[in-house]
Amino acid sequence: MNTNTLLIENKKAKFNYFIEEKISCGIVLKGTEVKSIKAKKLSFNNSFAIIKKEELWLENLHVSKYKEGNIFNHDELRPRKLLIKKKELQRLKKFKEKEGYTLIPISFYLKKSIIKVEVGICKGKKLYDKREILKQKSIKKDLSREIKYK
């Protein structure tokens, strides 16, 4: 039985980056942030993970304010600490030292009742890579249509 429930996925990450590896980690959140994320009120635009002082931080993740929240509502763009084992952090450092690699949040999911983040070690795609993928998708669609109508 799979206990992981996908909350939200970063679809642009798969289009803009080659995902080399995925790492699951916890995230430090406030109460109203948890409720907003469970309501799928977050945006991945320009978000990334960065290593500061032997810790992994998620930057530029926009979590909307909780509608029923009061004066204790959270700051929408605050940096959020990611919880990860030291061995995995060392491995991430090695990838970050290489040219062109970045850490991008791929998805948020529930494991039992705890919110987890899947962070991908990604390398940016060039424009011609994206065009090639779009061509392959359109060819695949055309073939499936032809097969369907024959």
Curated annotation (Swiss-Prot):
Any one of the GO BP annotations: trans-translation
Q: From which domain of life does this come?
A: Bacteria
Q: Where in the cell is it found?
A: Cytoplasm
Q: Please provide, in alphabetical order, the Gene Ontology terms of the cellular component aspect for this entry.
A: cytosol
Q: Which InterPro entries match?
A: SmpB, SsrA-bd_prot, SsrA-bd_prot_CS
| CDD domains given in the database record | SmpB
> Could you tell me the keywords of this UniProt record?
Cytoplasm, RNA-binding
- An example molecular function term from Gene Ontology annotations: RNA binding
Its chief place of residence is: cytoplasm
Q: Per its database record, what is this protein's job?
A: Required for rescue of stalled ribosomes mediated by trans-translation. Binds to transfer-messenger RNA (tmRNA), required for stable association of tmRNA with ribosomes. tmRNA and SmpB together mimic tRNA shape, replacing the anticodon stem-loop with SmpB. tmRNA is encoded by the ssrA gene; the 2 termini fold to resemble tRNA(Ala) and it encodes a 'tag peptide', a short internal open reading frame. During trans-translation Ala-aminoacylated tmRNA acts like a tRNA, entering the A-site of stalled ribosomes, displacing the stalled mRNA.
List the NCBIfam families. PRK05422.1, smpB
Provide the family line: Belongs to the SmpB family.
Which PANTHER family does this one have?
SSRA-BINDING PROTEIN, TMRNA-BINDING COMPONENT OF TRANS-TRANSLATION TAGGING COMPLEX
Q: What is the official name of this protein in its record?
A: SsrA-binding protein
